[in-house]
């Protein structure tokens, strides 16, 4: 049997299969193979952070209140595609996409509605937003200030990982160089203004969903992480001033053993890179802390209830692998946005693992398993070789511009598709054990009238604000973007005056330009 990462999985593992110098160590100690904290889940479970957002800010706010009442421990905001791409809801390119795959946020007014009656000093919030990540973070900070909550009390994460957008996802705006400058500006701003905030979630999840193997997922993610560290150092930041706030985001597939090994390998690889290559001294700079989401790409529209089983196995792998927070997908997400019932069942899956399985009673319970330790070594070996190939191009950005990571992922995705089509890779309910008839399922649908209502609110905002003050603030932002000063303070002032997400992003487009990928065959 071959692992997803390409190496052979043996039918039996013995003591001789484990490297005698395997860096297993102790939990909470370098190189953190067994976990970043000594006690891990024995004192408190991982953060159960369910990703949600659709339609209007008011509708998403209602869903957040439902999730908090059901026991979720942190919020995770999904934004619609126009917001992710830095467009306002009334722009022609946004037509038909407003509120579809996440919530539409155009201005501080929408952000205020999104977190209505949610005390921002009492909840940790993750925002899946990249190219305009700094814009949404500043809107969040402004709403917190209206609540009387200082930036020093805010806790959460913005994804803010633009490099993986060039590789796998595509919601980029600006070219790599100014994008990395914006990331570094965010690091510097948050160090002073929002010190408990995780300023980036360096993401392998999207690459995995595009077809990357476990080894490719962690290799390309860690290579991107190294690029961000270099950008911050080049901007004059000291490594231990920002590295403790770096975080990561990985997938959890149903291939349980390899996934556990992947998480363990990633932790020790990052610890060594930060210590040996970047000279980090603070132990927190060496710790790879990560969020996990179960693999949406493995969910099926056929017999969707079977996805409950898939998600439970995936979640088990994430927890056994030492994740800091977890989102479990709803069983109906291969069809549409989750319903209230399916979202509740997804959360209950985590709660059963945390409170009924006994898994939280022992740190890294798979440690010492011949199979797990050997697989951890193998995944690390494969991923290390891939990182070397990335940097043979000069940098991660150079490799991206040559299409290396994208081509590697596409080759892997093609192999997986062929294996499913041929039946070599079994997908229960799809190419084996299919049902003769499928039960009718009624998915959650987003009301098309939402777009018209959002556009009307945006028109009212433009009519009500001080347009001269907004234009002046945007001009100041453009001047800063063309120079060397940190753009976030000026961006915040424009947003406070009710400039829109689209207006801020268009201002930066005018200075930095937009990215046009080079197609390679």
Where are these regions (language model features)?
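Active-site capping/gating regions of soluble enzymes
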Residues: 203, 219-228, 235, 244-429
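Flexible, glycine-rich loop/tail regions that form catalytic "lids" or insertion modules at the edges
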Residues: 1-20, 30-32, 81, 339-340, ...
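Catalytic alpha/beta active-site cores
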Residues: 1-253, 258-259, 277, 284-291, ...
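A short glycine/serine-rich beta->alpha loop
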Residues: 123-129, 211-212, 255, 297-303, ...
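Catalytic or ion-translocation cores adjacent to nucleophile or general acid/base/metal-coordination motifs
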Residues: 151, 182, 337, 518-521
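Generic secondary-structure signature for well-ordered alpha-helical cores
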Residues: 73, 116-120, 145-150, 184-196, ...
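Conserved active-site and cofactor/substrate-binding residues in soluble primary-metabolism enzymes
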Residues: 27, 58-62, 70, 105-109, ...
